Amino acid sequence: MKNSSIVLASASPRRSELLESAGIQFRVVPADINEEPFPGEEPVDHVQRLAEGKARAAAELAEGRFFLGADTIVLCDGEIMGKPKDAADAKRMLNKLSGVPHEVVTGFAIYDRERKGAVVEAIRTKVFFKKLRDEEILDYIATGCPFDKAGAYAIQGGAAHMVQKIEGSYTNVVGLPLCEVVDALRVIGALGN
């Protein structure tokens, strides 16, 4: 798809792969912002704020017109799960997710430098994990896969066998709700017809 200078404000290879799979041309300019939640901040507000913050931060670093930022969290029993700090944190997260449904929430923002405004959305997907055995958790942690993933797992990788079902967008769980992002890019004029 043709574009008018789209910049992805993320170093995530998964987000890049998803955009590439849709035929979208873009450049990557990672934006580093503080990702700590504000006290009392609601999960949807949190991911939307971070997504827009990343998009606007990338606009300070690079040329272009449209800047796409995104942030994904896992929400389980009211806890916002970002990326685990270490193996013990990954084990704690996976134990908490074991056998219970949880939500993956991805906020995305497309900042339009020309119009000086942003489209900001959040998409929720419900994920159901099977009951995990301790050795499954430890084996998965040993792969190193959990450490750069919200909730300590990647549905598209080594954790696929842990997921019984999902309700909602699969690509949202991967890290970017592609259907909604492509629609938003089209609506704001970043893509051709």
UniProtKB/Swiss-Prot annotation:
InterPro entries referenced in this protein's UniProt entry, alphabetically: ITPase-like_fam, Maf-like
Q: Which reaction does it catalyse?
A: dTTP + H2O = dTMP + diphosphate + H(+); UTP + H2O = UMP + diphosphate + H(+)
Q: What would be an example GO MF term here?
A: dTTP diphosphatase activity
Query: Where is this gene product found?
Result: Cytoplasm
Q: What class of enzyme is it?
A: hydrolase
- One GO CC term on file: cytoplasm
Q: Where is this site: Important for substrate specificity?
A: 14, 72, 156
One Pfam family of this chain: Maf
- Gene3D superfamilies listed in its UniProt record: 3.90.950.10
- The active site of this protein is located at 71 (proton acceptor)
Instruction: Keywords in alphabetical order, please.
Output: Cytoplasm, Hydrolase, Nucleotide metabolism
Does the entry feature the keyword Zinc-finger, yes or no? no
Question: Known EC number(s)?
Answer: 3.6.1.9
Q: What is the stated purpose of this protein?
A: Nucleoside triphosphate pyrophosphatase that hydrolyzes dTTP and UTP. May have a dual role in cell division arrest and in preventing the incorporation of modified nucleotides into cellular nucleic acids.
Query: What protein family does this chain belong to?
Result: Belongs to the Maf family. YhdE subfamily.
| Entry-linked HAMAP family | Maf
Protein name listed in UniProt: dTTP/UTP pyrophosphatase
Natural source organism: Citrifermentans bemidjiense (strain ATCC BAA-1014 / DSM 16622 / JCM 12645 / Bem) (Geobacter bemidjiensis)
Q: Where is the organism placed in the taxonomic lineage, from the top? A: Bacteria, Pseudomonadati, Thermodesulfobacteriota, Desulfuromonadia, Geobacterales
